[in-house]
Amino acid sequence: MDPIISAASVIAAGLAVGLAAIGPGIGQGSAAANAVEGLARQPEAEGKIRGTLLLSLAFMESLTIYGLVVALSLLFANPFIK
């Protein structure tokens, strides 16, 4: 096993998880803030806002999980190591 390839794989795995968490983290914070603002303006639309918020948060969180899958495949099932 080449040490340069394994070191690059560890760095890439760390970057994959870190970068995959930044975008959804910012998006989830923004979505939650806008949902709270919408609830403050129209409390009667709580059910519709909550359902849409939970669905969008699940989609955003799936991006982070995909980054984790890429990182785990680089660490444990690396296609670049023969």
UniProtKB/Swiss-Prot annotation:
Keyword field: ATP synthesis, CF(0), Chloroplast, Hydrogen ion transport, Ion transport, Lipid-binding, Membrane, Plastid, Thylakoid, Transmembrane, Transmembrane helix, Transport
GO CC annotation: chloroplast thylakoid membrane; proton-transporting ATP synthase complex; proton-transporting two-sector ATPase complex, proton-transporting domain
SUPFAM superfamilies referenced in this protein's UniProt entry, alphabetically: F1F0 ATP synthase subunit C
Transmembrane segments: 3-23, 57-77
Alphabetized PANTHER family for the sequence: ATP SYNTHASE LIPID-BINDING PROTEIN, MITOCHONDRIAL (PTHR10031), ATPASE PROTEIN 9 (PTHR10031:SF0)
Note: In plastids the F-type ATPase is also known as CF(1)CF(0).
Described function: F(1)F(0) ATP synthase produces ATP from ADP in the presence of a proton or sodium gradient. F-type ATPases consist of two structural domains, F(1) containing the extramembraneous catalytic core and F(0) containing the membrane proton channel, linked together by a central stalk and a peripheral stalk. During catalysis, ATP synthesis in the catalytic domain of F(1) is coupled via a rotary mechanism of the central stalk subunits to proton translocation.
Quaternary organization: F-type ATPases have 2 components, F(1) - the catalytic core - and F(0) - the membrane proton channel. F(1) has five subunits: alpha(3), beta(3), gamma(1), delta(1), epsilon(1). F(0) has four main subunits: a(1), b(1), b'(1) and c(10-14). The alpha and beta chains form an alternating ring which encloses part of the gamma chain. F(1) is attached to F(0) by a central stalk formed by the gamma and epsilon chains, while a peripheral stalk is formed by the delta, b and b' chains.
Protein name, UniProt field: ATP synthase subunit c, chloroplastic
Organism: Cyanidium caldarium (Red alga)
